[in-house]
Structure formats: C-alpha cells, structure tokens
C-alpha cells in the first residue's frame, strides 16, 4: 500500500509549511489525484486520517478531486478520454497512447489556522 508512504510525504510537506509559514493547523486540505496516477483515493484518505493524530492535519477536512484521464493516441492522432491505464483508444482501439492529463498527485490548496505557539 504505497498510499501510506504518499500520505507521509504529504504530511511532511504540510508540517514543513506550518513551521515555515507559522500556522498552527490545517482545517481544509484539497488534493488532486488524477485517475491515471495509480493512487487509490480511499486508501490515501484513510492513510492521511490515520497518521494525522498529533499533527497540524489532525481534524482537517480532506477533499480529494479526481480529474479524468486524457491521452494522445499516436495511431489516430487524436486526443481521447482515458478511464484507466491500459485502456485502448476510444477512437481506433489502439494502445499507443501518451497520457496528457490525469497523472498528477498534488496539494491544490489548504485552509489554515494561524494561532502559532512556538515549541
């Protein structure tokens, strides 16, 4: 389950930002996990909630958007929607596809409380 490792990386980014920007906690975290990025969104949410205790993420609302996959078909030279990796081109049925969208995993934005108390 690589989602736990990804959640740890996201939490580290948030903790680093909290120290640097001097905010106390995240109240809303918005992520984007494209349909082609290879992340199970429910598992990522579970992992984030599981490791949030005692951190700036504890109690935060976590929203994860899942943009659709898009690809360029090298056989029929067309942009096509792609529901999952390994799916054929919806136009020609070919498999020579270059993903162009839906592969991202990123922090979109966050809402924070700025009651900073240095340790």
From Swiss-Prot:
What is this protein's record name? Hydrogenase maturation factor HypA
Q: Spell out the family assignment given in the record's similarity comment.
A: Belongs to the HypA/HybF family.
Keyword annotations from UniProtKB, A to Z: Metal-binding, Nickel, Plasmid, Zinc
Among InterPro entries, the record links this protein to:
Hydgase_Ni_incorp_HypA/HybF_CS, HypA/HybF
Q: Which GO terms describe its molecular function?
A: nickel cation binding; zinc ion binding
Task: Decide whether keyword Metal-binding is in the record.
Answer: yes
Annotated Ni(2+) binding sites: 2
Give the range the annotation lists for the signal sequence.
none
Q: What does this protein do?
A: Involved in the maturation of [NiFe] hydrogenases. Required for nickel insertion into the metal center of the hydrogenase.
Q: Which GO terms describe its biological process?
A: protein maturation; protein modification process
Q: Where does Zn(2+) bind?
A: 73, 76, 89, 92
Gene designation per UniProt: hypA
Tell me which Gene3D superfamilies the record gives.
3.30.2320.80
**Matching Pfam families, A to Z?**
HypA
Could you confirm whether the keyword Metal-binding appears in this record? yes
